[in-house]
Amino acid sequence: MANTPGAKKAVRKIARRTEVNTARRSRVRTFLRKFEEALASGDAGAAKAAFVQAQSELMRAVSKGVVHKNTGARKVSRLAARLKKLSAA
């Protein structure tokens, strides 16, 4: 339990940041799911549009510190590879 006023304030700040970061992470997952659905449909155009949105959202999460830089880069790379595979087919 936080005893000092500074510690109590830190607990409040952490709670607020956790809420914001959870919302950001959820938003990233939503865009990733939309990309997955576009891939499953087999429509290259829709998949490309969904990829651009998912990439943008992932990189925004990286810049906000919600996702580590390397994790974001790895996810984008894998999404791009899957999009390329669909476009080639």
Curated annotation (Swiss-Prot):
Instruction: List, alphabetically, the InterPro entries matched.
Output: Ribosomal_bS20, Ribosomal_bS20_sf
SUPFAM superfamilies given for it?
Answer: Ribosomal protein S20 (SSF46992)
Q: Is rRNA-binding tagged as a keyword? A: yes
Q: Which branch of life, at top level? A: Bacteria
Q: Which GO terms describe its biological process?
A: translation
Q: Which UniProt keywords apply?
A: Ribonucleoprotein, Ribosomal protein, RNA-binding, rRNA-binding
Entry keyword RNA-binding: yes
* GO cellular component entries: cytosol; small ribosomal subunit
A single MF term (Gene Ontology): small ribosomal subunit rRNA binding
Q: What does this protein do?
A: Binds directly to 16S ribosomal RNA.
The UniProt similarity line reads: Belongs to the bacterial ribosomal protein bS20 family.
State the protein's name: Small ribosomal subunit protein bS20
Q: What is the lineage of its organism?
A: Bacteria, Pseudomonadati, Pseudomonadota, Alphaproteobacteria, Caulobacterales
Gene that specifies this protein = rpsT
